[in-house]
Amino acid sequence: VYNQATFIGASLLLYKATGEKTYLDNAILGADYTMNTMSETYDLLPVESGVEQGIYTAIFAEYMAMLVNDCGQTQYVPFLKRNINYGWANRDQTRNLCGGEYHKAQIEGATIDSYSASGIPALMLLFPADK
């Protein structure tokens, strides 16, 4: 997710700096690949081994917010909200902590590192619930 996030972000920053649509198209291709290929197993962002995975979701969220809000690419909002909804529904409800595998319920009291716990809150901050 990190590589996709930074590719999307770099493409968007180049698009904003130059106005060249090719860069926006590249960002869209990166977002589409993340959503349609990397996330196809559960229709959720994938997680790999490593303690830093959750922060990658936060970085992805930052650049997806730029793609959605600054570039009008709202087709990603349902996918992003699905991740939020699954991650929050499967949190450790005693502590309200989310883990990195959004499709799995968190075991109450289990160790959840701060990076893993950061992904869903980052998405929630950038893509708040509809009122």
What are these regions (language model features)?
Residues 14-21:
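Inter-helical turn/loop segments and adjacent helix faces that build the functional surface
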Residues 1-3:
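Extended, leucine-rich alpha-helical cores of fungal transcription factors
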Residues 22, 27-131:
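CBM-like carbohydrate-recognition segments
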